[in-house]
Amino acid sequence: MTIGILPEYALLEMFGFYVDEAQAVEEAQTEDDTQAVDNARDIEKWHTLVHVCRQWRYVVFASPRRLKLRLLCTDRRPVREMLCIWPATLPIVIWSNHRPISLMDGVDNIIAALEHPDRVCRIDLRSVPSSLLERLADLMQRPFPALEYLELRTENEAAPDVSDSFLGGPAPHLRSLLLKTVPFPALQKLLLSASHLVRLNLWNIPHTLYTTPEAMIACLSSLPKLETLRLGFRSPRPHLNLTNGPLPQPRTELPFLTSLRFLGDSEYLEDLVAWITAPLLNTVKITFFDQPVFEISHLPRFISRAEKLNALNQIDLMFDSRSVAATLSPQSGEANCPRLRLEISSTESDWQLSSLVQVCRQSLPTLSTLKRLDIREGQYPRPRWQDNNEEDAHWLVLLQLFTAVEDLHLSKRLALHVAPALQDLAEERAAVVLPALQNVFIERLPPTGIIRRAIKQFAAARQRLDRPITIKRRKRE
């Protein structure tokens, strides 16, 4: 049998599988800037099919919904000519190539596509100059009834406000919204009308658009289908006073939320998660701005209400010149496994250690279940370590949190600081710090030197307490 004698329904099923696979890749790449070009190409997979033969072309255009046909309009294409060639029923995707200069040169093509608001299903414009953002926003002061995906990004922190009449009011079919550095005062009004929203990403939020936790919770309560939430503030907000307003009763449940990303002050997050339940939460990444004192009580309760985040049994502590982070995950290491990451923006090593102790102690309900502890440096240059008794004390306070850890993995650089801190422990304290420890793995452990002497002295103290440990050399991962 040759493919030419297949019935049309069989061809349609084959084409549907082909396009569905492309769409799955597209959705997976939605949040990844580096994949933007491939993402756009995936939208046009159907072009290959219609150019094979007349029969295939007929099958494709006879089933535009089943095959999710869309017309890709960019700043570098003659959009007006394209609109005359292809069927007028095809939904329009507006996409920029993410280069501001090219986008300015090709703005007429973007405008030509925006002139068909009833057909536009997706708008993806990144690195938009502020002057162009204002112009495009003015062109979008009308309803876009088919719009499902909207992404606007500008790098200009002085970008003008987007008008309250943006999109002409409600956006009932909107499924994904990403705004980066885009000042949109009427955002709350838009969110309250977008009940089908699945992904919400508000990043680099300026102080002029500050939304109280109470108002944000009210918006989230109107988004029952939300799966991904990302909130990122531009900088710490001075003189925080977030708890005076009335909070909602009862707690808002987000039954489909699986991913949460937050960048901001701990006080804001506390007031937010105190009134949210997300039982299917699978991935959490939280970055706190540097602050002297962390007062966290609602976050661990929020985490404990997510079943998948209560089965994490290993923790990775990463230090670099910009931040310190603690990442919890299962030891299985499977793809798409549950993951909880807490990060603190801090540069000084002693401050990193003391902040990490505060956040881990207050935020992590599963400390007593962790079996593996990794301590390593990050991709940026290491922080400025002090190498003094005060820093040793900080290390010991941190390690004392992990009462169930059996395996300790140290990178070579961090072993230079952790091992000396363990070296001079009195025997009674050697039983308190990492009491369940059985194995120490040190990256490229030399046969002699500071690290070897320090860790051997700690091992001897544990041996006298009848709590022996094994020292092993670990290859660099």
Where are these regions (language model features)?
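Leucine-rich repeat
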Residues: M1-E477
